[in-house]
Amino acid sequence: MHSDKIDEFLKKRKTADQAGGQDRIAKQHEKGKLTARERINLLLDEGSFVEIDALTTHHYHQYDMQKKKFFGDGIIGGYGVINSRQVYIFAYDFTVLGGTLSKMGAKKITKLMDHAVRNGCPIIGIMDSGGARIQEGIQSLDGFGDIFYHNQLASGVVPQITASIGPSAGGAVYSPAMTDFVIMVDKLGTMFVTGPDVVKTVLGEEVSFEELGGAMTHGTKSGVAHFVAKNEYECMDYIKTLLSYIPQNNTEEPSIVSNDDDPNRLDHNLINILPEDSLKPYDMKEIIHSIVDNHNFFEVHELFAQNIIVGFARMNGKTIGVVASQPLFLAGALDIDSSNKASRFIRFCDCYNIPILTLVDTPGYMPGTNQEHNGIIRHGSKLLYAYSEATVPKITIVVGKAYGGAYIAMGSKNLRTDVNYAWPTARIAVLGSDAAVNIMNRRELASSKDPEALKKQLVDEFTEKFANPYVAASNGTVDTVIDPAETRPMVIKALEMLSNKRDRQLPRKHGNMNL
């Protein structure tokens, strides 16, 4: 009886499924790119995607826009399941007017973000956009503003993840920057506020799309990209792995993943990772891999600010966030980028009930005019703020050097870290022994007949008196000195002890971190 209406509906649905049409889909494939719908189906469990607002269109007539109406209006979105966990998802569709954002497209995105917050589910955005739709003028800009506001509303409530698999320019770049994690696909994803043409016009500077805002640029230099994927398939794998470590929302804890790694496992070779000479570099990741479940560590921001390591792991099946000095780069010294990288990660962990394990081997903050003039004081203070603010369980282990302000900043007892351990190899002091002797004994060394022998003697005396873990243990700065072989079981026991931790901050609207 209603066959005509059903036929009309099926025709419209088929048209919506084809987005910008077969010709544009073919062009997308020729560029080596999947379509928005293909990307969503690749990420979600098979058959789980439920589309919302599939028949949306714009309502503009200027510039012959009435002839350029496509169902979906450049955004495909809805909800589905990833490894049996519900998520909300939207993807910019480059086959429809270059994936430009319209007023209706923005309404679709913010509707999905509202659903995600109300239902306590992660929200995932896939970027492939030419930016604002110029034909809609201020309405398109209003749309971006609404999205930014919703990014703020969702922040710290549900995880927000962005996949950059195409261009993002102008206003389109700020929403990804406000999300928790950004995955960029190498040679496909680009992000910049102003493109190469504008840069050339204004500054006379010749720069390619990749150099200005490609995945490697943002993965290694700006820090905008947390992960750089080789292709779209690896990008989706990053998202799936990331979701496996984090909870659905801020009221839940991450899922416990059972495994066969003995929580009491010892590693008597762990101490051998550290060189006898404390000035020689070593790879802190070897220590991390040794102590976590099944030696699996999911590193975040691997290519950026490599003098500090952050990422996720599990201890006895429970997710933890790891923050660690990396002596292989800048001797593990803290600088502007590493301070920003670590403080951002710590705050994410605190938002989503993820305990923080800190491994320390740092000689201090990076010196020099470049660091001072670019604000190491301001940026370095973020790390102090992030640790102090975090109320999740916090465990710190000093494995090597811990000098000066950097010692305090790296999860010290003074910042209300719950458990502080030190290895016998730890050196906790205001300064390294060599630098301290140079300052305190300058006159003696200058007048000595054998300054080298005297300096060695003074350095040894300073180390014995001050730069060792036992002085710190004697005054409670660290809770105890532990056998490195027992690091894994000691951390797991501490996590179990802290599993019911309740820590409340003083009432306030919000703190004022020195951004």
Predicted regions and their residues:
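Ligand-binding clefts of soluble mixed alpha/beta catalytic domains
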Residues: M1-L515
